[in-house]
């Protein structure tokens, strides 16, 4: 039996990239998944894209991860449909690159709202439900850019570094409370996902790969 068989997961940014890959993997091992994403059109294609799985094994939720009320609704929908919450993968994110002088304050706030505030909200509202389920695992997708800075990624660097330390704080909180809930951040290097599309569009795919390397 898989470690995740019968478990229930919420995945943000699940319509594409790492979020979608995680959803497929968890479902292949018997988990039930709530697929959250802001892109309704792509979510609507999930029954076809996931046709090899039992259609009762997943559900979708159109979700602005920066909206607190939407998080409350997502948590309630997941518990109502699947009965519990065991896993949260905070995968939603954006990358709007610019140096510290060129970055507009509205852009700075937007990047932090999507990349960092959403992780705070997800953890805040998932932990009480996970503690009721007996155990849980939270995986927050940070980035190598949360460890190694770039001169032209000020907002992205700081938002992803924030995810790293927030995850540590959440893990310590759960340990202090005696909850059997793990919280970890992961820090991928460059992965060919839609978050890199602006870079590829700006420089062309080959030059973008060369710059990122």
What are these regions (language model features)?
Residues 123, 159, 167:
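Active-site helix of classical SDR
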